[in-house]
């Protein structure tokens, strides 16, 4: 039986590739919109979808059918139907777009940081429904938090889908109100709202997703798929040394150890001699696969499964980084970073010990020193050695990981040089690494 979400078609793999993060507050319609995008682009199994639709009808929940595509897919994944299927994708005219970290995940914000460090662009879904919109961008709203995050993670390409237009009877006034409020927030974050497309959509009904809707005669901009089609794939840093943060490790009968992750920089080829750090285990690349197809070489942006000889599954874990033996990824003893405090109920001082999420790693850390506080607008220091920093502050700090972890300077390897600090179930700060003090690594 085919998976509910179809694998990439041969045409897709010929197209430039973009990783898209879908963000927004819970219940604003992210899953439904993703399901709708996959359906409209021919990436949903027709027979499977008919079953889902019938089931939704019987239960009187017709509006849930598109969201249930993702639920069905998650079930397939949990039953171990596919390994590579953590990523789903669809095609536009010019691009193949992979959706990273499907919405609705419990650790979505954390994964946004780890996952969005892999995103080239973001789709922000905001509901026009009264109450839902106000909650989403309010002080405690996830919508607001997600926008802060994608900004901190350096994602420049953004489209805003104003969803559930059917619920507000396609009211232009409500759309303009939502657009104006979100624009204010984007401006505050340093985006230029005039350069960002807002599209009034209904994920349930399909308005303005693939085709222009007659329900919104007052809107004459592009459809959502047309906007996505304008996104530019980022330059892929093939000339840098190899860095591949590990997302998952499997042991496959007859094949040995397979590490799964995304190549962030450099090029990986079959036959390469590689090292995984912090554990400092060395092995040889037997083969590389993406979406069930063998690759001779993997480049930045490729999500791959790498079959490695000489390394056991027990030796490596999510958060380790694969590199080549002639340029070993940096295991760090201490870092100096610029952070922005996104949320904290009181104040942060030296000795504060949150958890750092960096690329695919999660590690307890301690802020050992507050070096200076900066003016957020100019980046100039306004206070040396402040006693504390609070929400909204930008500061340069010294951080000590309490366990071995790979971290690089943001200027050398951006995806391994940006991180989030979490505590109390919330994202406290996001940052970029300015300096790294390397730890000694003995290759085994």
Swiss-Prot record:
* Start and end residues of each stretch annotated as G5: 202-204
Q: Where is this region: G1?
A: 24-31
* Subcellular localization, as worded in the UniProt entry: Cytoplasm
Question: Which GO MF terms are attached to this record?
Answer: GTP binding; GTPase activity; translation elongation factor activity
Region annotation (G2) ranges: 80-84
Where do the annotations place Mg(2+) binding?
31
Principal subcellular localization: cytoplasm
Q: Which reaction does it catalyse?
A: GTP + H2O = GDP + phosphate + H(+)
Q: Give the start-end ranges of region G3.
A: 101-104
The UniProt family comment states: Belongs to the TRAFAC class translation factor GTPase superfamily. Classic translation factor GTPase family. EF-Tu/EF-1A subfamily.
Name of protein: Elongation factor 1-alpha
Q: From what organism does this protein derive? A: Pyrobaculum arsenaticum (strain DSM 13514 / JCM 11321 / PZ6)
Q: Report the gene name.
A: tuf
């Amino acid at each position: 039986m085919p998976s509910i979400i179809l694998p990439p078609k041969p045409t897709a793999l010929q197209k430039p590739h973009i990783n898209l993060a879908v963000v927004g507050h819970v219940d604003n319609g992210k899953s439904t919109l993703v399901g709708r995008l996959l359906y409209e682009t021919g990436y949903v199994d027709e027979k499977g979808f008919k079953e889902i639709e019938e089931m939704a009808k019987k239960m009187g929940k017709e509006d849930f059918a598109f969201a249930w595509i993702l639920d069905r897919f998650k079930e397939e994944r949990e039953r171990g139907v596919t390994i590579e299927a953590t990523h789903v994708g669809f095609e536009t005219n010019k691009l193949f777009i992979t959706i990273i970290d499907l919405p609705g995940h419990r650790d979505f914000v954390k994964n946004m940081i780890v996952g969005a460090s892999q995103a080239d662009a973001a789709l922000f879904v905001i509901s026009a429904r009264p109450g839902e919109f106000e909650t989403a961008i309010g002080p405690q709203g996830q919508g607001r938090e997600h926008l802060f995050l994608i900004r901190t993670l350096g994602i420049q390409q953004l489209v805003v889908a104003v969803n559930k237009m059917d619920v507000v009877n396609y009211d232009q006034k409500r759309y303009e109100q939502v657009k104006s409020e979100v624009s204010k927030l984007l401006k505050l974050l340093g985006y230029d709202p005039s350069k960002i497309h807002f599209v009034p959509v209904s994920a349930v009904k399909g308005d303005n997703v693939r085709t222009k809707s007659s329900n919104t005669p007052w809107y004459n901009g592009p459809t959502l798929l047309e906007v996505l089609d304008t996104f530019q794939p980022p330059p892929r840093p093939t000339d840098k040394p190899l860095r591949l943060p590990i997302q998952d490790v499997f042991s496959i009968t007859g094949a040995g150890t397979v590490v799964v992750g995304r190549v962030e920089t450099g090029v990986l080829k079959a036959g390469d001699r590689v090292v995984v750090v912090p554990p400092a285990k060395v092995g040889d690349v037997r083969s590389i696969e993406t979406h069930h197809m063998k690759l001779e070489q993997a480049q930045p942006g490729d999500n791959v499964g790498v079959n490695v000889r000489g390394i056991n599954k027990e030796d490596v874990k999510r958060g380790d980084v694969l590199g080549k033996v002639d340029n070993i990824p940096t295991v760090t003893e201490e870092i100096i970073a610029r952070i922005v405090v996104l949320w904290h109920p009181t104040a942060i001082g030296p000795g504060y010990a949150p958890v750092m999420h960096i690329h695919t790693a999660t590690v307890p850390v301690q802020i050992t020193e507050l070096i200076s506080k900066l003016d957020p607008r100019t980046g100039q220091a306004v206070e040396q050695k402040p006693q504390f920093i609070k929400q909204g502050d930008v500061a340069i700090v010294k951080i000590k990981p309490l366990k071995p972890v790979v971290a690089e300077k943001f200027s050398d390897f951006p995806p391994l040089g940006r991180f989030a600090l979490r505590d109390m179930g919330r994202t406290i700060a996001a940052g970029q690494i300015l300096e790294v003090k390397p730890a000694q690594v003995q290759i085994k």
